[in-house]
């Protein structure tokens, strides 16, 4: 993983996750637990710093092997943790991947996710060379759908039974971004 990667639009910074981010990520997850439990299968009521450290331990290898690219989102000074975004579920044969994001509860409604999606999609297209990025949001997750629409993603339809989160099955809206749309 390249620790030198740092993308910014002047309002936020996204950069690869680091082990030293564990405390602030865990704090953000715990603050946002009520919302995260609905949409994040990895989140659970007892989420602790040990969970975060275990996850972070695997990020370097995932990045190095081209399996997943996880970023943290910070304010422009790099001092306040705002959320996370990732390119994952990569399909090399057809050259596309999933793009996911979350913003801690105290930072919602400030354009953080929209800005992060713009930055990470540029990375996905220009650096990684993907020809398509997909944003999949549960039908009930209106906030994620708004972000997809704000960045110009095209709504392609409803995928039935697309998400399973804590044994609940959700239909999801499929959005796509392609390089020309940005």
What annotation goes with each model-predicted range?
Residues 1-24, 28-35, 70-182:
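Acyl-donor (CoA/ACP) binding surface of acyl/acetyltransferases
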Residues 43-44, 57-72:
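A short helix-loop-beta-strand connector motif used in the catalytic cores of GNAT acetyltransferases and
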């Amino acid at each position: 993983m390249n620790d030198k990667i740092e993308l910014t639009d002047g309002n936020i910074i996204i950069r690869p996750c680091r082990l030293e981010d564990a405390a602030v990520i865990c704090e953000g997850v715990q603050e946002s637990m009520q919302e995260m439990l609905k949409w994040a299968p990895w989140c659970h009521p007892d989420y602790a710093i040990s969970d975060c450290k275990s996850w972070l331990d695997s990020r370097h290898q995932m990045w190095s092997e081209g399996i997943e690219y996880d970023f943290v989102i910070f304010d422009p000074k790099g001092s306040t943790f705002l959320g996370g975004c990732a390119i994952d579920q990569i399909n090399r044969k057809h050259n596309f991947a999933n793009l996911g994001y979350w913003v801690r509860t105290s930072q919602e409604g400030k354009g953080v996710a929209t800005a992060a999606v713009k930055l990470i999609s540029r990375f996905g297209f220009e650096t990684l060379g993907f020809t398509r990025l997909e944003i999949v949001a549960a039908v009930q997750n209106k906030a994620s759908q708004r972000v997809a629409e704000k960045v110009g993603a095209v709504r392609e339809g409803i995928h039935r039974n697309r998400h399973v989160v804590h044994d609940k099955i959700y239909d999801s809206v499929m959005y796509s971004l392609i390089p020309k749309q940005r």
